Amino acid sequence: FAFAVWQVRAEVDGTRELATLHEALLDSRSWFGDHDERLAHEYAAHFGMPSDRLLAYWRSLRYELDDRMQQGALHYYALAASLDEAAPLGALPWANVAGV
């Protein structure tokens, strides 16, 4: 199940701004991985749970759209298309962030 996906309009595909955003998201994910224990201790009370439970939850999250998640997204689009809520989609379109 893909809970959230960063999406952009087609006209920003391949732009320097998109590449910059992509790099910032990767840097943020890396920074969080280096500081997750401290953050769990700092914010456990805010979330009303022990820090080890919060840390375990955070570490259970995945940030890559693997094949299974991509198939789930396509299934979601197919269901939406069957209700005339979205156009049929045969494949997930990917933005060009490396070719800038």
For the regions a protein language model found, what residue spans apply to each?
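A bilobed periplasmic-binding-protein/Venus flytrap-type ligand-binding module shared by bacterial periplasmic
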Residues: 1-17
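Aromatic-enriched hydrophobic runs in primary sequence
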Residues: 3, 9, 25, 57, ...
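Generic secondary-structure boundary/loop-capping signal
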Residues: 3-5, 62, 91
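Surface-exposed loop/turn and secondary-structure junction residues enriched for glycine/proline
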Residues: 9-11, 64, 68, 95-97
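Secondary-structure end/capping motifs
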Residues: 14-79
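Long, low-complexity C-terminal extensions of enzymes
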Residues: 81-100
